[in-house]
A protein has these predicted regions:
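Ordered hydrophobic segments in well-structured contexts
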Residues: 1-5, 29-30, 56-58, 144-146
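Conserved NAD+-utilizing ADP-ribose enzyme module
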Residues: 23-24, 39-40, 44-161
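Glycine-rich loop/turn
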Residues: 1-29, 37-47, 83
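N-terminal cationic and glycine-rich segments that engage phosphates or anionic surfaces
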Residues: 34
C-alpha cells in the first residue's frame, strides 16, 4: 500500500526521536493512505512551525510481509470502545516509555479538538460510548498508520511522487 506523510519538509530518513508524545497511538511516525488528508496535515504543520512548505513524502508498505516477519501489528477496523480507550491511554502518556508494545498500529484518526472530552472521560463525566462518538474524526472516515519502532520503520520504502 502507498502511504503519505504530510510535513513542512521532505522526509528522506525517518527519525523516531523527533516524534511527539501524546498522539493517538503513541510516539511514532504517522502516515495516511489518503494523500489529500496527508496534505492537510502538511499545511497545518507548516503553519504551526511557521517554516518550510507543505510537503508530502511517499512510502510503500507491505503489511503482509511485516506480519509474516513477526511484527506486532494492531488493527482497529473502525471506531470502537477499545479504540477510544487505546487513544486515551496514549494521549495521557507523557513519558518516554510507550504505553503499548505494538510495532505498528492501524486505525481511525481521532478528532484533534477533543482534549476536553478526553479529560471529562478520565474524570468519569463521560461514558466510553459517548467518548467514541466525540472522538470520531469530523472529516472523511480517515485511517492512520503508526510506526513506533525502528524495526517497523524498516518496512517503509521511500518512493518519489
Amino acid at each position: 500500500i502507498r502511504l503519505y506523510h504530510g510535513s513542512n519538509t521532505v522526509i528522506e530518513h525517518i527519525d523516531l526521536s523527533r516524534s511527539k508524545r501524546g498522539k493517538d497511538f503513541g510516539q511514532g511516525f504517522y502516515l495516511n493512505a489518503n494523500p489529500d488528508q496527508a496534505m492537510e496535515m502538511a499545511i497545518r504543520t507548516a503553519r504551526f512551525m511557521n517554516e518550510g512548505q507543505p510537503t508530502l513524502s511517499c512510502f510503500e508498505f507491505d503489511e503482509t510481509k511485516a506480519d509474516e516477519m513477526g511484527l506486532s501489528i494492531k488493527v482497529f477496523p473502525d471506531y470502537s470502545e477499545e479504540w477510544a480507550e487505546f487513544v486515551v491511554m496514549n494521549r495521557k502518556n507523557d513519558s518516554d516509555i510507550p504505553a503499548h508494545s505494538y510495532d505498528i498500529v492501524i486505525g481511525p484518526i481521532a478528532d484533534d479538538t477533543v482534549g476536553v472530552q478526553i479529560r471529562r472521560y478520565i474524570m468519569g463525566y463521560l461514558s466510553v460510548a459517548t467518548l467514541v462518538e466525540e472522538l470520531k474524526f469530523k472529516g472523511d472516515h480517515a485511517f492512520q498508520y503508526f510506526f513506533g519502532t525502528p524495526r517497523a520503520v524498516e518496512f517503509l520504502k521511500r518512493i518519489e511522487l
